[in-house]
Amino acid sequence: MRNYDLSPLLRQWIGFDKLASALQTAGESQSFPPYNIEKSDDNHYRITLALAGFRQEDLDIQLEGIRLVVKGTPQQPEKETTWLHQGLVSQAFSLSFTLADNMEVSGATFTNGLLHIDLTRNEPEQIAPQRIAISERPALNS
């Protein structure tokens, strides 16, 4: 029997908390760039990408249907550098996140090498639970 680890796929599904947390494991692989997804409450999320060496002009964020795509293309140095040790990676990347229904990007900021993308879940009124008042008058057919 083969075991398939779906956690690398599920960690990029934002707003599908029950599904993602049920299948996600602690030993998930990390891709470039490193990122966090935090949940403030049931309706507010934040994706934070660590982008040392990138400038704001090097970054592009697009929402394509339910896919949030973040791309980065760093500026190439004018002069070739000879590295004795290179621990900081500055390479082109493209990351995509699948958003749940009714998730919207509410804003993005780039400060101190960290790109923050804020997401909000906006439930339409017809989907949100409605409280039905109970009256004291008799029913129609009684």
UniProtKB/Swiss-Prot annotation:
Keywords annotated in UniProt: Chaperone, Cytoplasm, Stress response
Instruction: Please give the name of this protein.
Output: Small heat shock protein IbpB
A GO biological process held by the record: protein stabilization
Note on domains (UniProt): The N- and C-terminal flexible termini are involved in oligomerization and in the binding of non-native substrate proteins, and are essential for chaperone activity.
Q: Which organism is it from?
A: Klebsiella pneumoniae subsp. pneumoniae (strain ATCC 700721 / MGH 78578)
Q: Where in the cell is it found?
A: Cytoplasm
Task of the protein: Associates with aggregated proteins, together with IbpA, to stabilize and protect them from irreversible denaturation and extensive proteolysis during heat shock and oxidative stress. Aggregated proteins bound to the IbpAB complex are more efficiently refolded and reactivated by the ATP-dependent chaperone systems ClpB and DnaK/DnaJ/GrpE. Its activity is ATP-independent.
Any one Pfam family here would be HSP20
Coiled-coil residue windows? none
A Gene Ontology term for the protein's cellular component:
cytoplasm
Instruction: Give the UniProt family note.
Output: Belongs to the small heat shock protein (HSP20) family.
The gene behind this protein is ibpB
Q: Which SUPFAM superfamilies match?
A: HSP20-like chaperones
Q: Which residues form the sHSP domain?
A: 26-137
Share what the entry says about its subunit structure, partners included.
Homodimer. Forms homomultimers of about 100-150 subunits at optimal growth temperatures. Conformation changes to oligomers at high temperatures or high ionic concentrations. The decrease in size of the multimers is accompanied by an increase in chaperone activity.
> InterPro entries of this UniProt entry?
A-crystallin/Hsp20_dom, ACD_IbpA/B, HSP20-like_chaperone, HSP20_IbpB
What is the protein's major site of localization? cytoplasm
